[in-house]
């Protein structure tokens, strides 16, 4: 142990200082110092790490993280430089031994991010995967209705059927109107002819006055055979025509009776 913390365990008595194996002509061990730019709290200090020295004095240090952490290891990379006159004092508190060792090199490393091991990178990859899946999903949603669309031939057939239905409806409406006009004209002409015949009977000196017990419009009106559609369309119109004919007949009868009394 070195530094002020190690000096706190020293008392005033004299101790024997020994030189370590690093001072031998052919040292069997070497001591190094490592300086980290940042050391995460996720590193498991109870486990051993791995130090590799490559070409050009490049150093790679791999330290395991706490179980369950992402990523499972933390990697540091840097370089080492040799020491010239630096030493380190090692104190064994169990035996009270003090040993001086010569430092071989100073290693300075920086934390790096291993591909696929960074938590931020993992989240970014998830977002990229989601963004990649979204266009594919939208394309499926957009293209699926197009497959269900009708073919051009079936679409033209539907349009043709609709046009034919509209034309048939227009023909029914026009035939209904023409039938109504012809029926109105026939009804009015029959009423006029009935009125003329009644006047001739009333003012003729030879023929007796005869009044038809039947309704003029019922006896003189021609019979028409109409379809069910025409009957439905003109039911109200026929009812109004019948009412007008009845009123006219009653009016003519009252006038003829007043003339005979005079």
UniProtKB/Swiss-Prot annotation:
Keyword Nuclease: no
Similarity-based family: Belongs to the EAF family.
Region Necessary for transactivation activity: start-end pairs: 177-262
Subunit structure and binding partners: Component of the super elongation complex (SEC), at least composed of EAF1, EAF2, CDK9, MLLT3/AF9, AFF (AFF1 or AFF4), the P-TEFb complex and ELL (ELL, ELL2 or ELL3). Interacts with ELL and ELL2. Isoform 1 and isoform 2 interact with TCEA1.
Protein name as annotated: ELL-associated factor 2
Protein task: Acts as a transcriptional transactivator of ELL and ELL2 elongation activities. Acts as a transcriptional transactivator of TCEA1 elongation activity.
Annotated stretches, region: Necessary for interaction with ELL: 17-104
Phosphoserine found at: 146, 151, 154
Biased composition (Low complexity): 174-192
Positions of region (Necessary for interaction with TCEA1 and transactivation activity): 248-262
Chief place where the protein resides: nucleus
Organism lineage: Eukaryota, Metazoa, Chordata, Craniata, Vertebrata
């Amino acid at each position: 142990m070195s530094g002020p913390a190690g000096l706190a365990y020293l008392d005033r008595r004299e101790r024997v200082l020994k030189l370590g194996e690093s001072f031998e002509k052919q040292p069997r061990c070497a001591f190094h110092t490592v300086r980290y730019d940042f050391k995460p709290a996720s590193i498991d200090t109870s486990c051993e790490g791995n130090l590799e020295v490559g070409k050009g004095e490049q150093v790679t240090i791999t330290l395991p993280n706490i179980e369950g952490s992402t990523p499972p290891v933390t990697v540091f990379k840097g370089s080492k430089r040799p020491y010239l006159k630096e030493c380190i004092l090692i104190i064994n508190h169990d035996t009270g031994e003090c040993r001086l060792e010569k430092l071989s090199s100073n290693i300075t490393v920086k934390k790096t991010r291993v591909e696929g091991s960074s938590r931020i990178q993992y989240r970014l990859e998830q977002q990229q995967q989601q963004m990649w899946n979204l266009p594919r999903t939208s394309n499926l949603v957009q293209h699926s209705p197009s497959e269900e669309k009708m073919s051009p031939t079936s679409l033209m057939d539907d349009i043709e059927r609709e046009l034919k239905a509209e034309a048939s409806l227009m023909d029914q409406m026009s035939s209904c109107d023409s039938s109504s006009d012809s029926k109105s004209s026939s009804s009015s002409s029959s009423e006029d002819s009935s009125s003329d015949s009644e006047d001739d009977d009333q003012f003729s000196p030879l023929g007796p006055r005869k009044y038809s017990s039947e309704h003029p419009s019922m006896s003189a009106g021609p019979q028409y055979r109409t379809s069910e559609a025409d009957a439905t369309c003109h039911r109200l119109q026929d009812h109004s025509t019948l009412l007008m004919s009845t009123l006219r007949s009653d009016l003519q009868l009252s006038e003829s009776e007043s003339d005979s009394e005079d």
